[in-house]
Curated annotation (Swiss-Prot):
Heme c binds at C35. Belongs to the cytochrome b family. PetB subfamily. CDD domains: Cytochrome_b_N. The chain crosses the membrane at residues 32-52, 90-110, 116-136, 186-206. It is a multi-pass membrane protein. GO terms for biological process: photosynthesis; respiratory electron transport chain. This is Cytochrome b6.
Length: 215
């Protein structure tokens, strides 16, 4: 094993990278409340893993979506556990994100020179809320259907472009298959990709600038 490690070390300087990751200074004022962002990240990773597992059984059609969710809950091996963890972790992610935002605001972590870190965090908060809206509709039950109808109907109040935005969100003039397809694509591909990109930016800036000092 040492020869294999030495081969990679010679080319990639693994030890230097590991030292840089593990040797960052942690200010003495840091407490458990500074872990809220990391807990949010952990919840996101759980969401990715459990969500990926459910894509093997979920069918994003208005005629089969609800039945496929029932199959996951009643027949698929450990399907009930995977979906339950997905739901619990989703709620935990939203809660931890809200608490993290409050912690950063109350401790002044948004001030110079960390304005861009705050901006990426706000974007991540919006993406997290979007996960909730799109995921809520996927079982395509009565609650999901009417939630989608209400949410996608909100932009209709915007002058001039309102009706166009509604049709863009729904895929047609009414809620149906096109709407479910759009929400499924957003929930399983677009939002996770954007979240991963902004999380990378967010953590890179934290690594560069360090943790903000006490008030």
């Amino acid at each position: 094993m040492s020869k294999v490690y030495d081969w990679f070390e010679e080319r990639l300087e693994i030890q230097a990278i590991a030292d840089d990751i593990t040797s960052k200074y942690v200010p003495p004022h840091v407490n458990i409340f500074y872990c809220l962002g990391g807990i949010t990240l952990t919840c996101f990773l759980v969401q990715v893993a459990t969500g990926f597992a459910m894509t093997f059984y979920y069918r994003p059609t208005v005629t089969e979506a609800f039945a496929s969710v029932q199959y996951i809950m009643t027949e698929a091996n450990f399907g009930w556990l995977i979906r339950s963890v997905h739901r619990w972790s989703a709620s935990m992610m939203v809660l931890m994100m809200i608490l993290h935002v409050f912690r950063v605001y109350l401790t002044g972590g948004f001030k110079k020179p960390r304005e861009l870190t705050w901006v990426t965090g706000v974007v991540l908060a919006v993406l997290t809320a979007s996960f909730g809206v799109t995921g809520y509709s996927l079982p395509w039950d009565q609650i999901g259907y009417w939630a989608v109808k209400i949410v996608t109907g909100v932009p209709d109040a915007i002058p001039v472009i309102g009706s166009s935005l509604v049709e863009l969100l729904r895929g047609s003039s009414s809620v149906g298959q096109s709407t479910l397809t759009r929400f499924y694509s957003l929930h399983t591909f677009v939002l996770p990709l954007l979240t991963a990109v902004f999380m990378l930016m967010h953590f890179s800036m934290i690594r560069k600038q360090g943790i903000s000092g006490p008030l």
